[in-house]
């Protein structure tokens, strides 16, 4: 809340945009930070039936936050170490910038909202990551995290396998079958000529 304080110890009446605020007669005025409470605030002190002049006005501007409701996908995904992830923000706001974060660390450049869906691409990920999306109004600097997140599991890259026997292998036609063995115990895919 924003707290305005009157120099008068008693008899205060607070005003917003020239209209008295009901029940606002204390030395301090607490203003909740909602955009509808933006305005010009003044105070008059009345003691023994005598009213002071109107105070100098204090202007209060409360800028709205970007919407937190655009949908973030994928909710979960799995990638290999060193890969990037493309995060889709559906229903972005025009005039709002979006950026991916992991905690306080930025994972992407900013992308301007269009009023529709936008894609943001992370930097290379090397560990399990919970991606959040920060929406920022570049004019007011007001920002908020979207409610949706993207949880990324990052799997390690296997060690490059070796082949036994080491080539080149040269035999005559009709020779018994050649058996090549991979050092990797699982997950093999063999290729010929590339």
Task: Give residue spans per PLM region.
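A short beta-strand segment in extracellular, disulfide-stabilized domains
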Residues: 1-8, 83-91, 170, 174-184
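Proline-enriched interdomain boundary motifs that mark the N-terminal boundary
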Residues: 65-75, 157-168
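Short, exposed coil/turn segments at beta-strand boundaries within extracellular/luminal domains
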Residues: 48-55, 80, 138-147, 172
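Solvent-exposed loop segments of extracellular immunoglobulin-like
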Residues: 6-16, 93-102, 182-192
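Surface-exposed, short loops/turns at beta-strand junctions within beta-sandwich domains
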Residues: 33-38, 122-128
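Surface-exposed, flexible coil segments in extracellular/virion-facing regions
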Residues: 15-33, 104-120, 179, 191-194
